[in-house]
Amino acid sequence: MSGTIENPYENFIALSRYARWLEKENRRETWQETVDRYFDFMLNHLDKNLNYKPDSKLVEELKQNVFFRNVMPSMRAVMTAGAALERDHVAGYNCSFIPVDNVRSFDETMYILMCGTGVGFSVEYKYVNKLPAVPETIEKTSTIVVVEDSKQGWARAYRELLSLLWAGQIPAIDVSKLRPAGARLKTMGGRSSGPQPLINLFDFTIKVFKNAVGRQLKPIECHDIMCKIGEVVVVGGVRRSAMISLSNINDIEMAAAKHGNWWEQNPQRSLSNNSVAYSRKPDMAQFIAEWKSLYDSKSGERGIYNVAARSEEHTSELQSHSCISYAVFCLKKK
């Protein structure tokens, strides 16, 4: 079929990750149709909101370069251009960052991930220590959290659960309004995972809180909750979440998060790449110990991220997002 990518692997990625389903034609878009959809959306956006129409020759030149992958726009925007991106601009961003320093960090992460945007997060002590303590007792109540069938509905329900847990209450969860697994998602594309991943997240979160009664959540517990949130974002059996977690150099539990057979006891940890965040130059003993920990883990984690170096470029408190991954210390030969 014309408009496809010659390289079969690249074409598979384009079809499986970015092409929308054409209901009337009972097929997926070709790569050319995906590129056209993206440009149609952006040109309409510029015209409607800024009263700007780029030169047609420039548009055609840009289209050709995107088609041949010489330059690429935000791939999240390529995936969502149309009704999904029109509904929520968050769906147009590749990456984001959030410190886990507020009870809202968790449900906001869920919403951002469900929009298709990657999330970098930090469970450094300076952030996690701002969270409220878990009550001395947590008991079941007659309160019912009703989950609405939308991204906002899922995030809102999770926010309600967390608020109740921090108030010492375990509510009942009503997921009767959610569409079944396999149902087509017409706006975002793909198919629904059904209510089970959300139920699993709620159960997991309740368990973590029960184990933390009378104290604040630890960084590793916040990390695990964030990773479990990432598990929810599965569309048609395909993982759609990208995450990276930053932690302190002296956080031994985070350093060992992917040591041993971690995937058996904590499979949710596969959802995030982990890096230690250096805010100042460590002494040689610390540095060597971190590299030895990385080697001993057999997973290549934690990675090493120099926050101070980034601070020279950006004066804000924001740190990193899911795209830094292991480009931090992987060199690509040309």
Residue ranges and their predicted role:
Residues 1-312, 316:
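Extended catalytic cores of very large enzyme megasubunits
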Residues 317-334:
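Positively charged, low-complexity/disordered segments
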